[in-house]
């Protein structure tokens, strides 16, 4: 007999308006309406961890949501979704502190936080906040 495997689907939360407008209440309302629509239909929702827009077509001075704070905000409102980042940049936060933050959020959300960590790749993003960027090795 074949083993049944559950497939999970996640929805990517935009962290900046694609029209270049500032992040404001109108944008947040659109995101909240989208999350209301996907809750119960998708298993998870995901945000990126960028301090400036990641998209090469987007003006780097475009306002965007900071991923950790925004994820905590949305997670508190939508109890039937798991949440995670695609992905957290390992050099934006001290590793020990990040582990504590992730463990705390996991406990507070009854295990709905999904931790994903990546290397970071956007040199101009590092430079804009004064972080060291050595590139890939």
Locations of regions flagged by a protein language model:
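Glycine-rich, flexible loop/turn motifs
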Residues: 64, 77, 88, 122-129
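N-terminal beta1-alpha1-beta2 module of alpha/beta enzyme domains
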Residues: 1-77
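Short beta-strand segments at enzyme active-site cores
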Residues: 43-49, 83-85, 114-118
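Glycine-rich "substrate-gating" loop/helix at the edge of Rossmann-like oxidoreductase active sites
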Residues: 58-65, 88-93, 132
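Structural motif corresponding to the early beta-alpha repeats
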Residues: 72, 76, 82-94
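Short, charge-rich binding segments
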Residues: 2, 73-81, 104-110
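Flexible, glycine-rich active-site loops centered on histidine and acidic residues
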Residues: 5-26, 92-137
């Amino acid at each position: 007999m074949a083993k049944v495997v559950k497939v999970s689907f996640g929805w990517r939360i935009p962290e900046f308006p694609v029209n270049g407008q500032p992040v404001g209440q109108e944008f947040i309302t659109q995101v909240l309406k989208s999350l209301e629509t996907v809750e119960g239909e998708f298993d998870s929702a995901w945000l990126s961890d960028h301090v400036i827009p990641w998209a090469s077509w987007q003006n780097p001075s475009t306002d965007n949501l900071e991923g950790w704070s925004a994820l905590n905000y949305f997670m508190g409102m939508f109890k039937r979704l798991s949440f995670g980042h695609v992905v957290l940049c390992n050099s934006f936060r001290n590793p020990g502190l990040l582990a504590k933050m992730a463990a705390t959020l996991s406990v507070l959300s009854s295990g709905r936080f999904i931790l994903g960590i990546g290397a970071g790749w956007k040199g101009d993003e590092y430079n804009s906040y004064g972080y060291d960027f050595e590139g890939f090795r």
